[in-house]
Amino acid sequence: MERRKRPRLQLRLNVEFSSAEGQAGGFGITDNVSAGGVYFLTPDWQGLRTGQNLALRLSGMNNSTDWPVFRTLGCKATVLRLDVPPDRKVPHAKAGVAMRFDDRPRVDMYGLTA
């Protein structure tokens, strides 16, 4: 039975994340995104923990016009689940990270916040 309140979109976006304490940070690629959160894969998972608050930036290309528009969404989010790889010793093994948006994502287009 599906427990999600919001539908998920299968989107591949770049993810950049950082903690306020500077203890965790890195990059990843989204697996899916909804209005309430995101699930992404990252090799930079070692400093992450459930319940941790992070700053997120999601970016990608929008080709809905005649020319591509680069867009970035920024927000605060909380780690809900960390799916660590079975063999943690493999270099660059990726973990799945489920996050809930804590505030409404802000759209940044060419550096102008809307």
Regions found by a protein language model. Name each.
Residues 1-114:
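Structured alpha-helical
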